[in-house]
Amino acid sequence: MAFLKKSLFLVLFLGLVSLSICDEEKRQDEDDDDDDDEEKRGVFDIIKDAGRQLVAHAMGKIAEKV
């Protein structure tokens, strides 16, 4: 009976250790993804501002012709 208790304790302990390692890796991956999201937002803002300027310039040219 003591052998079964020790075996069960060992299995549970190893399971918890592997679970905590997986959680740490998941957190690191999420942190990396957050950095990528910030870069994507920065690029999107640049594209959006360029589009606004292009539309404003085109509208100005159309207004001059009318």
Swiss-Prot record:
Q: Which residues carry this modification: Valine amide?
A: 66
**Which UniProt keywords are listed?**
Amidation, Amphibian defense peptide, Antibiotic, Antimicrobial, Cleavage on pair of basic residues, Secreted, Signal
Q: Where is this gene product found?
A: Secreted
What domain of life is recorded for the organism? Eukaryota
Q: In which tissues is it expressed?
A: Expressed by the skin glands.
Q: What is its main location?
A: secreted
Question: Keyword Signal on this protein?
Answer: yes
GO BP, sorted A to Z: defense response to bacterium
In the UniProt record, does the keyword Nucleus occur? no
Which cellular component, as a GO term, is one annotated location? extracellular region
Indicate the residues removed as propeptide on maturation.
23-39
Instruction: Extract the signal peptide range.
Output: 1-22
One Pfam family, please name it.
FSAP_sig_propep
In the record, the note on similarity to other proteins reads: Belongs to the frog skin active peptide (FSAP) family. Ocellatin subfamily.
Function of the protein: Has antibacterial activity against Gram-negative bacterium E.coli ATCC 25922 (MIC=300 uM) but not against S.pneumoniae ATCC 700603, S.choleraesuis ATCC 14028 or Gram-positive bacterium S.aureus ATCC 29313. Shows very little hemolytic activity and no cytotoxicity.
Q: What is this protein called?
A: Ocellatin-PT5
Q: What is the lineage of its organism?
A: Eukaryota, Metazoa, Chordata, Craniata, Vertebrata
